[in-house]
A protein has these predicted regions:
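Structural beta-strand/beta-sheet cores of well-ordered domains, especially the beta-sheet scaffolds
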Residues: 110-112, 229-231, 334
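Intrinsic-disorder-associated interaction segments
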Residues: 14-18, 72, 146-149, 197, ...
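Catalytic "initiation/cleavage/transfer" segments centered on a nucleophilic residue
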Residues: 209-305
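Generic detector of well-ordered alpha-helical segments enriched in charged/polar residues
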Residues: 22, 26, 80, 154, ...
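Modules that initiate DNA replication and primer synthesis
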Residues: 184-189, 237, 278-338
């Protein structure tokens, strides 16, 4: 039998067939969400792109691995090129302003992704089978056949929708799995919103990394990752594949598991203190905004002016600060926050 990475084949056997990488990323970044392809110097404010990174085995003059950055626009041109790469390629489900993949440049989160490594597998020796599969392999060091039962992966499925939310996709990355929760609407990454997302992601990570799912369930072993973490791109080589260059067997694969999710659905699985703030990207087009808010459109879009701010003299600020410091009383009508 021909198989890719073990978890990919196990998901196939569970009737979760592999999805083409382009289809997967179109689900993550719906048509029209990313900026259209433009020439190098034709940047426009208010248009955002995804950013992919590829780490090569080739070393630069400083003896460090060469890293290439690719802007992913709405036509997915560079993504098509990356899928033919033999490098370690990763990307986060986030759109960015500009070319630098930093948290300050992050604009919208399209999916929450949780990585789980070292999934629990039960192994037992068996007599020589008629043929090897992803569940039966030959152990050269012990000179015997081993049957593998992927109990960690199956435990996840038994508890999706019960103890933790059901993901939209699972990417079999080789050594583990990536759970993608694709949002029905993208979430703007304002700093206060991003903070609640980080808290939620950390909590969900702890919930998923339990002893029934992974061998690395101890607190010191759990991999808590940033909201902005990039993940191996489906269709590209796994960690083993980077050595074997076997694109048929050793590549990451995406498998459709469930529907897109809402913040409300995700929040229903955690206590109040871990919940995300409910805010979504506006559905208004620029044309609609022009009709509804003509003055704003003229000032911000046509003239390119900055957001309006209220400025006051420093002595007025100091006067109010002194009043608050000296006069504020709990329960008083002027009890306030500045």
């Amino acid at each position: 039998d021909i198989y890719m990475n073990y978890y990919s084949y196990e998901l196939e056997s569970m009737h979760y067939e592999e999805v083409d990488p382009m289809t997967f990323y179109r689900d993550v970044f719906p048509d029209g969400e990313l900026a259209p392809h433009r020439e190098k110097d034709d940047y426009k404010t208010g248009e955002y792109s995804a950013i992919a990174m590829c780490v090569s085995n080739n070393l630069n003059p400083n003896e460090k691995h060469q890293i290439k950055r690719y802007t992913i626009t709405d036509d997915f041109d560079n993504l098509d090129y990356i899928l033919n790469s033999e490098d370690f390629c990763f990307m986060s489900p986030i759109s960015y302003a500009g070319k630098n993949r930093t948290s300050n440049n992050a604009r919208y989160l399209y999916a929450l992704c949780i990585e789980i490594d070292n999934l629990k597998v039960n192994n037992k020796r068996i007599f020589k089978p008629e043929h090897e599969t992803h569940r039966i392999t030959y152990n050269k060091s012990e000179k015997c056949y081993i049957e593998h039962e992927y109990v960690g992966l199956h435990s996840l499925f038994e508890n999706f929708g019960v103890y933790y939310p059901k993901p939209t996709y699972i990417v079999a990355s080789g050594n583990g799995v990536h759970l993608y929760y694709i949002f029905e609407k993208a979430i703007p990454l304002y700093k206060n919103i991003a903070k609640t997302l980080e808290i939620y992601k950390r909590r969900l990570t702890k919930m998923l990394w339990n002893k029934k799912v992974t061998m690395s369930y101890k607190e010191s072993d759990i991999q808590y990752e940033s909201l902005y973490q990039g993940f191996r791109i489906p269709g590209t080589l796994t960690k083993v594949g980077l050595k074997t260059k076997n694109k048929r067997d050793d590549r990451a694969t995406a498998h459709k598991i469930g529907d897109k999710v809402s913040i409300e659905y995700m929040n229903s699985f955690v206590a109040e203190k871990y919940k995300m703030s409910v805010i979504y990207k506006s559905n208004l087009t620029k044309a609609q905004a022009k009709d509804l808010y003509p003055e704003w459109y003229q000032r911000r879009v046509v003239e390119g002016k900055e957001k309006k701010r209220w400025y006051c003299k420093e002595n007025l600020y100091t006067w109010w600060l002194n009043r608050i410091t000296e006069e504020t009383q709990v329960g008083h009508r002027y009890y306030c926050l500045m």
